[in-house]
Regions:
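Short, low-complexity N-terminal intrinsically disordered segments enriched in polar/charged residues
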Residues: 1-32, 36, 130-176, 180
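Hydrophobic/aromatic beta-strand elements that line small-molecule binding cavities or substrate pockets
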Residues: 86-92, 104-107, 119-125, 216-221, ...
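Short beta-strand edge/turn micro-motifs at domain boundaries
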Residues: 114-148, 240-263
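A solvent-exposed, acidic/Ser-Thr-rich amphipathic alpha-helical stretch
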Residues: 23-97, 172-219
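A generic structural micro-feature
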Residues: 81-82, 95-97, 113-116, 210-212, ...
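Extended, well-structured beta-strand/loop surface patches
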Residues: 97, 110, 145-158, 226, ...
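Short beta-strand segments that buttress and anchor functional surface loops
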Residues: 102-109, 204, 229-237
Length: 263
C-alpha cells in the first residue's frame, strides 16, 4: 500500500485507522513487506505473526489486514481501551525515499486515564504509491519517568562492541554482536530476517571482513526495561550513512536485534 503523501501522514493514519478498528485502513498505513520487531519476546498465540512477535513479517496488505481481523480489538477493549493517542513524531534521519521517525503512543480509557505507553522507532519508505510504514522497532517495556540510564549505557556499549569488531574486519566476533533472528531494513521494499550467525556470515561476511576505518556518533532515542532504540551517523571507509537500531536484552545479554540504514 504505502499511499500517503508524506511520512507523517502515514504515521497518523496508523493511529486513526487503528482507533476506527478498520483492519484494511490500518494495513493501508504500511509499506510492504512490513515488519514489527519487539524488544520483548511474548509467547506465541499460535495464529501466525502478530504485531508483538519478536520478528513478524507481513508480505502484503492483505496479510496484515487478515491478522488484524483475526486478532480483533477485543483484547484491547477488555483493558478498558477506547482509543490510542500517538505522540508527535520526531525525524531522526531522512532521505528522499526513507525516514526514521521517533514516535510512540498511549492507550486511553473512556475517562482519559492511561492504560499503557510505548515508544517506537518507525521506518517509513516511499514506494511507487506513496509513503508507508515499512518497519516498527518497539521498546515494549516503556515507563514514563523511569531511570533507564543503565539500559542506555548497555545498549551504547553493545553498539560500540559492534563497531570495534567491524573496524578490523573481525567477522567471527562481529557475528556475536547480534540477537537472532536479526531484522534488517534496507532500501524501500527491502526487509530481511537473518535466522542465525551462519546465515549472516553468508550474506554479509565479505562486507564485514574488510578492515576499514570507522568514525561514528550515536545517541539513544528511547529506552525501556529490556530494549533501547539508538541512532547513529557513521563513516566507514569512504561511505557515510545513518542507522537506527533496536538493542535488546535477551537472556542477560544486550545485543542488536534490528537495524535500519539510510544512505
Amino acid at each position: 500500500m504505502g499511499s500517503h503523501a508524506t511520512p507523517t501522514a502515514a504515521y497518523w493514519s496508523f493511529f486513526e485507522n487503528f482507533n476506527r478498528k478498520d483492519a484494511d485502513g490500518w494495513a493501508g498505513a504500511m509499506s510492504y513487506p512490513h515488519v514489527r520487531v519487539s524488544a520483548v519476546q511474548p509467547p506465541r498465540r499460535g495464529d501466525g505473526p502478530g504485531p508483538r512477535t519478536a520478528s513478524g513479517v507481513y508480505p502484503t496488505a492483505s496479510d496484515y489486514a487478515a491478522m488484524a481481523e483475526r486478532a480483533g480489538w477485543e483484547r484491547f477493549e477488555l483493558t478498558g481501551w477506547v482509543r490510542t493517542q500517538g505522540i508527535t513524531p520526531r525525524v531522526v534521519h531522512a532521505s528522499s525515499d526513507k525516514v526514521h521517525l521517533a514516535g510512540g503512543w498511549t492507550r486511553h480509557r473512556a475517562d482519559d486515564s492511561e492504560i499503557v505507553t510505548n515508544r517506537v522507532l518507525y521506518v517509513l519508505s516511499r514506494m511507487e504509491e506513496g509513503w508507508g510504514i515499512q518497519a516498527r522497532f518497539g521498546i515494549d517495556g516503556y515507563n514514563k519517568g523511569a531511570d533507564r540510564s543503565a539500559q542506555k549505557a548497555a545498549a551504547l556499549g553493545a553498539l560500540e562492541r559492534l563497531m570495534t569488531t567491524l573496524e578490523p574486519g573481525d567477522v567471527d566476533n562481529w557475528l556475536t554482536c547480534f540477537h537472532y533472528p536479526l531484522t534488517l531494513v534496507g532500501a524501500p521494499g527491502e526487509v530481511s530476517v537473518i535466522d542465525d550467525a551462519e546465515a549472516m556470515r553468508a550474506a554479509y561476511g565479505d562486507w564485514a571482513g574488510e578492515a576499514l576505518p570507522i568514525s561514528y556518533r550515536a545517541n539513544d532515542i528511547a529506552a525501556g526495561e529490556n530494549g533501547v532504540t539508538l541512532s547513529q551517523s557513521i563513516t566507514r571507509g569512504e561511505d557515510t550513512f545513518h542507522q537506527s537500531f533496536l538493542v535488546a536484552q535477551q537472556e542477560g545479554e544486550w545485543k542488536i536485534l534490528a537495524v535500519s540504514a539510510i544512505a
